[in-house]
Structure formats: structure tokens, C-alpha cells
Amino acid sequence: MRKKIYCLLLVLCLLLQLALPVSASTMGDMESYGVRLIQYYLHHQEKATDVIWDITRQMKELDPKQGAVWEKIMFDWSWINSDMPVYEDTIPTDLPTDDSLCIVVMGFGLNADGSIRPELKDRLKVALSFAMQYPNAHVLVTGGQTGAVDGVTEAGQMAAWLQQNGLAKTRIILEPQSLSTTANAVNSYKLLTRAYPKVDSIALVTSDYHIAQSCAMFAAVSNYQSGYKGGKSLELVGNAVCDTGLTENSLVTQAWGMSLIMGIPFDEKAKAPELYHVDIPVEVYVEPTETEAPTAEETQEALFTPEPETVEVQSKWKAIEKWVLLIAGLVALAIFWIIMPKKPKKRNRREKPKMNWDV
């Protein structure tokens, strides 16, 4: 009887595992795919476009929701580093004019005495011009304590400077906790989505060499929260930068931040993965004609978009496979129950054995 109970529990565990939308092995596979995506882009950038499309396609087969999130993250990351327009010492003119827009000003390390450094002041000058051009927009200043004076934060010093130079206090939002670009993105997203529900678009202000990293982190946080957690999407609609003459744009730092946001490991010293050939279906990628050449964004979007019918068929087969395994488990349990030998009846201890008197 005990063996039957153990067998029944084993089959029930199997059925419970089949009923779960994503198994532990699937989660492990998704993490492995995510690590590969980041490493491929880190080492090969746009040369890995076909490979990235192939990996996100495989991820969608395992879990359509998670695969779609990664697809959007990789598309945005690539676009930010290759095709995103950067406004240097000028302000974009086509952004929302109401209070749905928030201008996010990235902090910069303070002096030991808590005073503002010249580069941060340059960022603030650009932010002030931005805010004057969009008088209904909120202005979020983000940055924690980086000087030696307790309680003096980048955000607090930035807010004070903006007020001293004519910006109304009611327009300023303080985020005084963050000590890294990734934390800037995470904490700013939380603050805006929880306390300012009308805000649905953001524009970033920082230094020229820092804009790609900042935009990549903010886009990744928004995609992760809206795609995985069902949160609100904050669209990145513009930027403005101060000119420093520096060209530093560390993809390693971006990859580390991306991994941190997505909750996957990152090995800076990992060997560069080798590119491989991918046959892109004709339905997915069509050669541009001479008369109507698509933009870089349209081309990348086509590469990252598999055929809808293919995804639908794959989902149906996965459902059929689950039911086949379920029925097979029940049949195996029934067969085991039938063929399992029964224990012989125990003799009643009170019943005395019959004596043979024929001697």
C-alpha cells in the first residue's frame, strides 16, 4: 500500500510540474539565453543582429512573454548605441508639451565639501534651458550623497541650483538615493510611476559620453517593469547633453547594468562568443527596394519580428505536448496499479494451527 501511495504522489508532482506555465528548467534556459544575448551584443554590437534575432526567437518558443521582453530590450539597446539622435547643446522641439513629460537630470559626483563640480553645473544649464522650453514638464534630479558632508546629496544640490536660477520649486522632483546610473534608472522609475501617474514619457539630460549608458538603463528598466511585472511603460522620447569633449561610452558598464536590471550573472572576462550563420526567413526580412529604402529602425524591427503564424503553431504544439505527457502519466499510473503484486493475507494470530493426529 505504501508503494502505491508513493507512486501516486510521484505522478501528482509530475502533473503539477506540467501545469506550471514556466518550469525551473525553462527559467534556467531563459537566464542562459539572456547571458548569451548580452555577451553577443557586448562583443559584436550590430554584427550580431541576426544571431540576436535567432536567440530571441528560441526564447519566444520557451516563453512568449519573456522572449518578447528580451526582444524589446535588445532592440532598444542596439538603437540607442547606433541610431539614437543625440542633442548636443540644443533642445528637441517635438516633445509633449503637457505635464506627461518629465525631464530627468542625471547627477554627477560632488566635491568633498558637497559643492557642485563644473560638469554637473553644465548639465544643469542644459536642463534649465530644457525646462524653460517645456514649461509644463516636471524636472526630476537624481543622485545620492557622493561628497563627505552627511545629508548633502547630488539631487539636493541640483534642486537648489535650479531654484536659484529661476525654476519653480513645484516643478522639481528629488530622487536623493542613487549612487550609480543603474540605480538612477530604477529609483527614478519607481518614483515617477508611483507618485506621478500622469507622467508617461521622459527626456534625459546628462553629459555627451554618458547619454548612451543612461538611456540604455532607463529603457531596460521600463521594458522590464512593463513587460515582466505589468507596470507602466515610460517612453524615452528625447535627450539633451552638455559637451565635454570626452568620447567614453563603455559597453562593459552598460552590459553590467543590463545584467543587474534583468537579474542575471555577468562575467566581464567571459570569452567573446563566436558568431554563426542564421537563415532569416523571407517573411521576416525583405531586401529593401531602391525606391523605398527603410530606415535603420524599420530594418531592425523587421529582423526582430518572427512570423505570427509560426509562433501560433509553436504554441499549439507545446499545448498538445503537455496534454500527451499528462495522459501518458495517468496511463502509467493505472498500469502500475493493476500489475503491482498484492501482499498475501496475514494469518490471524488467534487462530491456532490444526494439529495432525494421524501418527
Q: Which residues are covered by each model-predicted region?
A:
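A structural signal for short, hydrophobic/glycine-enriched beta-strand patches
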Residues: 25-262, 292-298
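Sec-dependent signal peptide cleavage junction
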Residues: 18-26, 315
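Glycine-rich flexible loop motifs, especially short His-Gly-Gly/GGXG/HXGH segments used as catalytic or interaction
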Residues: 249-290
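C-terminal low-complexity, Ser/Thr- and acidic/Pro-rich disordered "stalk" regions positioned immediately N-terminal
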Residues: 289-318
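Positively charged n-region of N-terminal signal peptides that target proteins for export
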Residues: 1-5
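Bacterial N-terminal signal peptides
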Residues: 9-17
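Selective detector of the "anchor" transmembrane alpha-helix that sits immediately C-terminal
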Residues: 319-340
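Cytoplasmic C-terminal tails of single-pass
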Residues: 345-359
